[in-house]
């Protein structure tokens, strides 16, 4: 007695069952880390979530999660600035920096505040501005507990505790804790220079030779 061949439909059903079971196993494996990954291309996101940084710089040993980020970083060591501004010729390591720079020439301000409508060239400037409306002050001084809306303001404030004065006057050597104080101080020297110059001109003029009226002879002012 010859056994009948299995129908094609039954064969397909069996293969579909195996495929479904494999899919379930894969799904369980993909949920191992507490998240569902639909596509294999999402592996890079999983790696970043686990703080895995396999791409290491040979110059400074800094690590990165993506090879493209390492490639951009290595330009700092090589000094290669391949992204050049067509308007002024200034060059940059990254294309994103060039895009931000180009807004100086174009005047473009794509980041707009929803509260007051003021626009900004960079997203970081918008974030800082929005703290005016929200009152957020995320930067706190460890010494006195005072809070600030910008990190630069905290750095300036901390100098009141440390006594650091990194801004030095090139004319007299006096140091200041803030660049704005140095600029204000430099105005004193700029005002002094014209006064000294005018004084020298006056002294020179008093010693220039002049003609005595009616004598036809030269005389020097202040000399007999």
Curated annotation (Swiss-Prot):
Superkingdom field: Eukaryota
Phosphoserine modification sites are 49
Primary localisation category: nucleus
Q: Which residues carry this modification: N6-acetyllysine?
A: 18, 23
Location of region: Disordered: 1-34
Q: Where are the zinc fingers (C2H2-type)?
A: 55-77, 83-105, 111-133, 139-161, 167-189
The entry's keywords: Acetylation, DNA-binding, Metal-binding, Nucleus, Phosphoprotein, Repeat, Transcription, Transcription regulation, Zinc, Zinc-finger
Q: Cite a single Pfam family from the UniProt record.
A: zf-C2H2
- Tell where it localizes: Nucleus
Molecular function GO labels? DNA binding; DNA-binding transcription factor activity; zinc ion binding
Record family assignment:
Belongs to the krueppel C2H2-type zinc-finger protein family.
Q: What is this protein called?
A: Zinc finger protein 22
